[in-house]
Design a protein with these regions (language model features):
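A structural boundary/capping signal
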Residues: 1-203
Length: 203
């Protein structure tokens, strides 16, 4: 959570303090009446909770955790981070699942229970998770079981950076400089290094 809030605080004109975002995550955790996965889902994705942005998915704000917390809308990975970090504060074991094209959260104690934060916390079994993948990539898309393996915090940060880069390239290319400067400080695997080299050519 701190890395993603630092990302948000690094943009021009933003509040350099991460305190508000951390305070909001703390508040969400304190306000959860039942500290279980089911309790978290009801608490975070209920009537007045966070939800997927279905009107403007590629809005750059959907990749900025402070904006997601303030607006209560986001994309799958940032909504998943809200769930993961609130759960961490409550001792609820959860892991992030970086499936290509979509992001899920898995119960840390049940390898067949997934949560789709973008779909208001819908629960999925393994078969339904595969079906969700094919609903995005096509019914004949090859599915590798490795797609349902947990990912670490650095992988989540890199993926959020990739999403934000794509959104800014489409919407606000003039704001890419600050993001590129930040990305140069974040170690990335070879595929992302190639993408970063292409981004450097746009400067």
């Amino acid at each position: 959570d701190e890395a993603l809030l630092l990302l948000a605080a690094s943009r021009p004109g933003a509040d350099p303090s991460m305190g508000a975002g951390l305070d909001e995550l703390d508040r969400l955790a304190r306000a959860c009446p039942v500290p279980t996965l089911d309790g978290l889902v009801v608490h975070l994705f209920g009537e007045d909770g966070v939800r997927g942005d279905r009107t403007d998915y590629h809005d750059p704000r959907n990749s900025l955790l402070d904006e997601v917390l303030a607006r209560r809308v986001g994309m799958p990975i940032t909504l998943s981070v809200v769930l993961l970090e609130t759960g961490r504060r409550l001792g609820v074991p959860l892991v992030g699942i970086g499936m290509p094209g979509h992001f899920l959260v898995r119960d840390g104690d049940d390898t067949d229970l997934y949560v789709d934060a973008y779909q208001r916390g819908t629960r999925l079994g393994s078969d339904a998770a595969v079906a969700r993948f094919r609903s995005i990539h096509g019914p004949r898309a090859n599915f590798d079981p490795a797609f349902l393996r947990p990912v670490d915090a650095r992988s989540i940060v890199v993926r959020v950076l990739n999403n934000l880069t794509a959104s800014l390239r489409m919407r606000q290319p003039s704001e890419l400089d600050w993001l590129l400067d930040l990305r140069l400080r974040v170690p990335a695997p070879p595929p992302d290094q190639r993408a970063l080299a292409e981004l450097c050519e746009l400067r």
